[in-house]
């Protein structure tokens, strides 16, 4: 499948499927497809959970209500086991992160040609449908968590306490402030970097495997590899959403500790 309609080589097929629908150029390039799908999936999450909340009954619940209640209880128990501070934001944030990332990851199970081919028929040359396989999306989410880490640190320790934590830890001596600052900044900055790149790396690799299977094998034999990989990838999808949520809670719990 090519943007101009001609037959593609295997290399061209893979390259085409890894190309985003973009506007702008250079640093200001925006991946429109990633933004659209992430917003749609976020809206889907809000709609489903609001619908369940509005129609919840104390009687015999439906299947959707049971599922939502199970997820909410699971996330709430996870937060209680990790976050020991007092905040009404953490549990809703954890739920949002878990479901939103899971839905973005879940897009990887859609056959690689379905939506891009449909988009091409509509005159859209490129389309990538897995937002969490876009480093811009994962790092944006990680930077949002990083901002909350700074906010919670300052809220609990004050500006002076936060500065002292960066400059007088682990060596409590003014002469070692440069060493302390270097060590603490590396530790602090590694949190959003590892958070964003871990999710991106796993989902990009998963997407690439599906594309390689579709690009290298004839259509009648692709299921021999794609079905087992999809079944395994269901575990990866769920696990990566869970890890992102847990690390978010852990980092905010560490920031909320009053030393």
From Swiss-Prot:
Q: Where are the transmembrane segments?
A: 29-49, 90-110, 134-154, 208-228, 230-250
Task: Give the molecular function GO annotations.
Answer: proton-transporting ATP synthase activity, rotational mechanism
Record localization: Cell inner membrane
UniProt keyword annotations, A-Z: ATP synthesis, Cell inner membrane, Cell membrane, CF(0), Hydrogen ion transport, Ion transport, Membrane, Transmembrane, Transmembrane helix, Transport
**Any single GO BP term:** proton motive force-driven plasma membrane ATP synthesis
> By its UniProt entry, which CDD domains does this protein fall under?
ATP-synt_Fo_a_6 (cd00310)
Q: Which GO terms describe its cellular component?
A: plasma membrane; proton-transporting ATP synthase complex
Give the NCBIfam families listed for this entry: ATP_synt_6_or_A (TIGR01131), PRK05815.1-1 (NF004477)
Q: How does it assemble?
A: F-type ATPases have 2 components, CF(1) - the catalytic core - and CF(0) - the membrane proton channel. CF(1) has five subunits: alpha(3), beta(3), gamma(1), delta(1), epsilon(1). CF(0) has three main subunits: a(1), b(2) and c(9-12). The alpha and beta chains form an alternating ring which encloses part of the gamma chain. CF(1) is attached to CF(0) by a central stalk formed by the gamma and epsilon chains, while a peripheral stalk is formed by the delta and b chains.
Its recorded name reads: ATP synthase subunit a
